[in-house]
């Protein structure tokens, strides 16, 4: 050991020797020693450290005995050295950019005033709304798993660099200085970092190489011996072990490392990695138990450690390798991935994780973190110096391939490329740091040496920097948490905003292909993909770095590399693949084999968008060729051939991968050509446009040549004069009397393709050549190119749109079902092409190109080609047959043909745009307008019908608010709605390309209805206005768009189509044809007149008088079956008369029609009223039938709503309902009428009236909270209650912005008791019995998950589907007393009658069922009464608790807030209680019990301190009704109030003594006077009474100082009065349910502004209602009478022992007998923004946890949803376990807020379901899973409703069972 001590002279030696010194046991003490050593080395050099003393610790006896571990136990020692002296306020990034990683569910902001590019986000910690006033900004939620980075402090991301410094934390707004020369002088820090990083890379590189060597040997072994027997197995095991034991890979180790290997005893271990565990933990535990033959507890400890650590766990450790290897094979047979590793390697892995943790603390927690980041960057940029001899570059070892990085991933350099340098040195001239400049020079030299043309291997090997080795090797080896910490460390390097950052980016660019290769090859854990996504944001979004990539060759080599990579499956990619990089760009023939390659195209798209050197980009020939070649590779993929005979047997969806990649390549190519819009040099701009156009046309014609084959060569002809046309097979067609040559191709017959890349490229070039980027092109570039001269060849201009037109026709044929036999794949491709994000680049480009041909080429030839492609030759020539197999298909195709013509003539967004931004805004405008139209839509509906690439754009919400008016939700269940602004409704076009056929019909109908309403005209006279576009097209390239409407080919097609419509009555075709004519009239009036009135040749003699388009339109006016188009036709003629008076319409019509009647064209009112009487009569009868049916349905619906309505209106708004739903008790008539109006009248089974037989209502009993107490030991609770008394607390105090100041929950010491809820529906007992018998057999045969306590008695209400486990009979008590009779002491004695027996048995059964559900056995009538009475009182208490949040001034109980079901339940239970009482009228038991226990003070003081007096109050009311109470009724109530007051005094005295009246914690308790200078008389009586009760709990030998008690006098008095008012309020509610109120007990006294007076006022109201003395008299009476007697009784020597026992018992049960809280009941406090949970969580855990966090809304505890609990045998999850065993709030339910998906999880029994969360977006959407990407904020009304109505209102069982029972009929009014 002495030699070892002497050998350690530096930190590297210490790290190397540590495994041996620590005996390969990595404990907390080992970690502490490591950190201590590293921290010591930070401040001192290696020579100044006593290494011998550090090593002696490891050899000491205390280390062996683990005494050091006991010292460290429970201490947070990792932060001691690095902790800042001052606590940082908010988000601190002084001197750097923020670059904070924002993860899913966090909120980010985009300000489009400060930055025009949506790439640059600002996190919510930095974004200050006050500094962006009047800016156009929007808040979004991070959706991508890799997250987004904050650009606060990054000048490049903003239009004005000063805008980068608007951080919420003012300290961060100091401009960044580039003078960093003084922050990197500490050589100790840099050298230490060099050592640490070198060691970390050494371990990971060797670990990776060793793992690959072992893996390859095992694979080779398994391939060589596929069929070996058991004997061979043993032999092979020994041979396999040799390379592991005698590992030759370790020869490169230095002596110290080799000595470690040569130890006699080598430990081996089996490990399982959490990320590779592909089985459930329960299965894993059972497998471990079975294989290792260990107790299940050991296996569960393994799985729990695996689950909690997110890391690697050792299952077994031994020196016997053969045994370990055999056990590992047993695990592998069970499909469990395990690893056999040396204990030494395991130690090193833990060591690397700890080193990473130390580096993380150094960068983020140290006081000098900024200087540390600069030092770390220098170390990272420098070359990796390996301490392994074989890895090290030296004069004798110049080519250590073992440790080099292959810059081309695993591929070889092809022979053609061997002479070419792929990676060029970097010339970064502005780097001021000399040290980094030297590192750059050295780096460039190594980069040059990496290219060795003469090398045999042809691998592009490079000896890289530490940064490069870490992102390639180390990231994958680290544990899950350490990976993320390393990502954060590297991210922090990019926050340093100086020129050296470019060098860091350059190093990433050089190894980009290698990282991409690893990401595709072995990234099962998605680590490399996340790494690339994050580094891509740090690098390629920076314009200066994006500019660097252009000249470096990065773009072209990445595209070429990606195309090679597409052909390989991930598992086929090895570290060194003996395959050279493909020379060119070639797509795989069958399918693309991996999808992860897509990430590089996303980075390339970012470069195209972010770069600011368009001239350099466009002039780079290599990039030009790469873009064109890669884009054109998609030309002839996915051939389509229509199936004509039978449906395809197998539907192949392999095309999806091509669509997946082509979308990104489209965006990349569009971004490349969009750079034209930024070019300011006219000559260069013209040159590049002509170059691109030439390439696009040449390649498009080549593609046409390959895809267009001649059908009949006899008719084909070629023109040898044109080289382009000479290669195309053409055919001569005669259509509409015009002969033209068209390309010989038939859509639907020949094979064709969806993708036409060169056609899209042509569109991109034409479009961007005429546009600027953010504003129109300047005047100097207006006429820089004349495209009319470029396209003088009309034939070429026609052929350029050939493929586009064929694709549009193909889509039309698919829409009409002509390709139906091709199955789902063809329709799905069409949908992807026309509906999703690809549409803007493909479908719109096709339309653009056809429009280009329409404007440029011969219109006659275009029409012939157009009709030929549609296959409508015969139709256009006047014969409506032979084109398609059947008439229906032909008509449908014609419909699509005309629709496309309309769209070609009206869809001019792309034709008239002047800039990229304008086109972007036009697209948004059109999509939003046509998503809304005339409807009122929610945000979700709008988003669902607009393509995702628009709705996911950050600025979508801004444009939505611009074009639509928003209305907030009205009720709790509503969403916010949008309505299109009136000024945009004129722009609605039913023929918009984005509308479906059904939607198009609705829009057209609504346009006409809107016109009818606005212009007060009949629907028949309305029409769809024609879109006027001629002014927009003027002076543009497309001014000749309507030229086809000037030729007879077009006119004859329209005329023949109209002939077919009239002859064959194709009335569905007419509206579109007429609209097409209307468009031509409006936009091309002069030229189209010759076509409109031209008399074409007569085809059929029957129509010889109508042979012009105009005359045929007139003829349509004579036909009633064309009435839908009459308004449109008259509008055409009206427009002609008004706009073109020189066109004499009347003259034309007289000449071309047989009998022209102007009254037909211009009808008078009399003419309009003249209709076919029979037709009108039938229409009238149809309307009557429809009206009658709708009236009947409406009546049924209203009846259902009246009987079953539950108010869901906004809680903050007073509820206005009919008396039938919420009867007020003040003006109620009688209880029976109230019940009748509250519930359904008929039996739910037989539908007969309830009075036909004994009637019972369905009810459900479950435990719920009936009371909650105060925790006086919690200062927060006491301060909050005091603020309640002082009036400082707001109404919505449950919501606050910063809940961290509170303990999270206000529910303490809850009392959970059985509560009833009736749904309001019932049945006859016989009908219910029959129903139960019928379902008994079904339940016996099914395995429904029904709680055992319910048995077979659990049913659903057939009407509302509510659960029912009990019933409440309707007793029809005709003797029910009123309140006046109660106070007048009018006795109504009723004897037991025989006719009550049938009802009696039902009532007793009902009571027995209630008792069974509580586990109480009902054997006597007295038991039955007690059970019903207790349920009644519990329901009263629960109701009062829920009503506290709806307090209304001037009212004791706000009865308006009680739902009809709740009132019905209380009445039914009360009547059941009273009815059972009548069964033992002659019994003296109850009255004597009350006299003994309650009225007798001596007994009450001993036994009555903990009884529920409400039970006896209810019992006393029944005694009074039976004449069993000798005292006056109101005196009984008065005495009961006294006894309750006594109970409260005892409880409060006990609890205040417990906390010593807060004498020692004044700083925490903020209790002050309420402002009254002179205490009232009632207060003095009250306080003096309380002081006497305090003496009961004071020890005799202690003298108590009452001065501290005086300071909280107001608080104590207020609390006592408020608590007494709770009991009074419940008594009042109990009284109003049992007695009909026929008077007004509310006397209106003058109100005081003082809050305390208001509280006294409430008690005074109750006292006055019960005709009792006022409160002052009550307190005075208690003070002078009961107080003296009670205290004397307690201090009486005879009963002293008994009294002491009472006091002792109260103290011992302090938690179960808590003082009642006067607060209204509510769930935990929630933050305003849901993303606050993500910010509060540790970001490391937030990223690493695979389970979503759910917050218990009862106690605030955080759980992991769907995470099984090990201690429960993995049979239930954390949430269920918490609800049953862990929650401190006793409840039958679990209520959890899922913070990641914004939903509520309701748990009940063994079931659970999801419910809408109280968090809504600003548009009123619940936005589950953040699917709309908008932040959600707490809705106070919804949260209150969740608490009061759902949780505490006993609705959870009904919701859970409704949503989890698949066989349940959800019912509804329509089933009645």
Swiss-Prot record:
General remark: Present with 49 molecules/cell in log phase SD medium. Deletion produces no detectable phenotype.
Domain commentary: The RING-H2 zinc finger is an atypical RING finger with a His ligand in place of the fourth Cys of the classical motif.
GO CC terms of this entry: cytoplasm; MUB1-RAD6-UBR2 ubiquitin ligase complex; RAD6-UBR2 ubiquitin ligase complex; ubiquitin ligase complex
Gene3D superfamilies: 2.10.110.30
Subcellular location: Cytoplasm
RING-type Zn finger ranges: 1241-1362
Location of region: Interaction with UBC2: 1134-1240
Subunit structure comment from the entry: Interacts with MUB1, RPN4 and UBC2.
Pathway: Protein modification; protein ubiquitination
Zinc finger UBR-type: from-to: 96-172
Covalent link location (Glycyl lysine isopeptide (Lys-Gly) (interchain with G-Cter in ubiquitin)): 709
Disordered, as annotated region: 1203-1227
Alphabetical keyword list: Cytoplasm, Isopeptide bond, Metal-binding, Phosphoprotein, Transferase, Ubl conjugation, Ubl conjugation pathway, Zinc, Zinc-finger
SMART domains with a match to the protein in the record: ZnF_UBR1 (SM00396)
Modification sites for Phosphoserine: 1218, 1222
EC numbers, comma separated: 2.3.2.27
GO BP terms, alphabetized: cellular response to unfolded protein; cytoplasm protein quality control by the ubiquitin-proteasome system; protein polyubiquitination; protein ubiquitination; ubiquitin-dependent protein catabolic process; ubiquitin-dependent protein catabolic process via the N-end rule pathway
Catalysed reaction, written as an equation: S-ubiquitinyl-[E2 ubiquitin-conjugating enzyme]-L-cysteine + [acceptor protein]-L-lysine = [E2 ubiquitin-conjugating enzyme]-L-cysteine + N(6)-ubiquitinyl-[acceptor protein]-L-lysine
Family stated for the protein in its record: Belongs to the E3 ubiquitin-protein ligase UBR1-like family.
Protein name according to UniProt: E3 ubiquitin-protein ligase UBR2
Low complexity composition bias: residue spans: 1212-1225
Purpose: E3 ubiquitin-protein ligase which probably functions outside the N-end rule pathway, since it lacks the residues essential for the degradation of N-end rule substrates. Mediates RPN4 ubiquitination and subsequent degradation.
